[in-house]
A protein has these predicted regions:
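Flexible helix-coil transition and linker loops at the boundaries of alpha-helical arrays
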Residues: 1-24, 56-61, 124-127
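TPR/TPR-like alpha-solenoid signature
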Residues: 25, 32, 69-71, 138, ...
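Residue-level recognition of tetratricopeptide repeat
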Residues: 36, 73-76, 142, 175
C-alpha cells in the first residue's frame, strides 16, 4: 500500500550489472520480495498473489524472467501445472537478459528447451559460479519435485546447502524446503 499511488521509479540495486544499468524498480522489488517471503513460508496462495502483482512492474526481460520463474514454481507447488505452463508463453530463447540468465535458463527448462542436468551439473568454482549453481540447482530441484522425482529433488537441495552461500535465495529456499521435509 505504501507504493500504491507512487510513480514508478528505478531503484539502484546493490551490485552493478555488466552494463551498469539499474534494472529494477521500487514496485517490482516490493512485490518480488513479498512473494519470496510468502513462498519461503509455504504460503503459496499469497506468494502467487504477490508475484502476479509483481508481473505488472516487470518492465524488462530480466524482471519478467525473475518474476515468471518464482510464480511458475509457486503455481507448481499448488499443483496448478496448466496455469504455470501458460506463464511460459512470453518466454523466448532470444531475450534481452543482462542479469537474470539463470532464471531465463530455468524457464527454458520448464518449456522443455533445456535439460535439467545441463543447468545443474553439480560442480562449483568461483563465487559467481557458486551463486549460479545455487540458483540453477533450486530451479532444477523444484522441477524434479513438481514432476514427482522427490529423491532427485532432495539430493540437489542437499548439494545446494553444501555450497554454503546462505544469502542466496535458492539456498534459503532449499533450507526451508528441507526443514519442511520436502
Amino acid at each position: 500500500r505504501l507504493a500504491q499511488n507512487m510513480p514508478l521509479e528505478v531503484e539502484p540495486d546493490g551490485q552493478p550489472n555488466s552494463k551498469n544499468i539499474p534494472l529494477s524498480n521500487l514496485h517490482f522489488n516490493i512485490y518480488y520480495h513479498l512473494g519470496l517471503a510468502y513462498y519461503l513460508t509455504a504460503n503459496y496462495e499469497q506468494a502467487a498473489k504477490a508475484y502476479r502483482k509483481c508481473l505488472q512492474y516487470s518492465n524488462n526481460d530480466d524482471l519478467l524472467c525473475a518474476t515468471t520463474d518464482w510464480l511458475y514454481m509457486t503455481l507448481c507447488r499448488q499443483g496448478k501445472m496448466t496455469e504455470a505452463s501458460q506463464l511460459l508463453e512470453p518466454i523466448k530463447e532470444k531475450m534481452t537478459i543482462i542479469e537474470n540468465e539463470s532464471y531465463h535458463q530455468r524457464l527454458l527448462m520448464y518449456k522443455g528447451l533445456r535439460k535439467p542436468e545441463d543447468l545443474f551439473p553439480g560442480k562449483s568454482g568461483n563465487e559467481d559460479e557458486t551463486l549460479n549453481l545455487i540458483t540453477q540447482g533450486y530451479g532444477v530441484a523444484n522441477f524434479y519435485y513438481c514432476t514427482g522425482k522427490k529423491e532427485q529433488a532432495q539430493d540437489i537441495l542437499q548439494k545446494i546447502l553444501r555450497l554454503d552461500n546462505w544469502a542466496a535465495f535458492g539456498y534459503i529456499a532449499a533450507e526451508a524446503d528441507l526443514n519442511r521435509g520436502l
